[in-house]
């Protein structure tokens, strides 16, 4: 179940638009719960959408291409608590893109089982040319690593394209770059 509009780039991955190797091709179904008109979570619709087959709830922290504000970690934590009160074993995954380092806590501090994002944005400090990250419970990270690579390899491999130096420089600079971006918003 997804609580937001999916990025158009994910429609083929999910199977909204048919594609070889999509989640739908693997038998994964998808339900989307729209936000209320004011951009907040529709708790009644979320409750109705969760059933015995629901294994994962995906929450997009940033507004993406929408006009709503981004969700705060506090709002995400409240939603996760609500979801887990209905189905405690459901995995709550947060697409954390653009949200890293903008608060003193991250979604994993308020109950998210898994957070994912792009290294090209905040965590890469503007220097990482490719990549993404997965963080969370050991089981979630391990399962995702095997889906992203192949059986037997898991998180032991991954593309770096010979740019590890840029990754490490980006990781080092990321908090300062993000702070600068936030400060520039205050002065605009």
How would you describe each model-predicted region?
Residues 1-6, 186-188:
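Conserved small/polar residues in nucleotide/adenosyl-binding loops
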């Amino acid at each position: 179940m997804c609580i937001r509009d999916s990025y158009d780039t994910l429609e083929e991955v999910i199977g909204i638009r048919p594609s070889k190797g999509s989640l739908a091709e693997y038998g994964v179904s998808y339900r989307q719960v729209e936000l209320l008109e004011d951009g907040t979570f529709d708790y009644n619709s979320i409750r109705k959408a969760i059933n015995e087959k629901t294994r994962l709830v995906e929450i997009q922290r940033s507004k993406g291409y929408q006009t709503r504000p981004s969700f705060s970690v506090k709002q995400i934590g409240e939603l996760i608590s609500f979801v887990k009160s209905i189905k405690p074993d459901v995995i709550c995954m947060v697409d954390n893109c653009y949200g890293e380092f903008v608060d003193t806590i991250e979604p994993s501090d308020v109950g998210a089982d898994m957070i994912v994002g792009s290294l090209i944005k905040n965590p890469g400090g503007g220097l990482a040319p490719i990549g993404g990250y997965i963080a969370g419970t050991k089981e979630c990270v391990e399962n995702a690593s095997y889906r992203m690579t192949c059986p037997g390899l898991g998180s032991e491999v991954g593309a770096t394209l010979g740019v590890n130096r840029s990754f490490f420089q980006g990781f080092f600079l990321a908090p300062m770059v993000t702070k600068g971006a936030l400060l520039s918003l205050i002065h605009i």
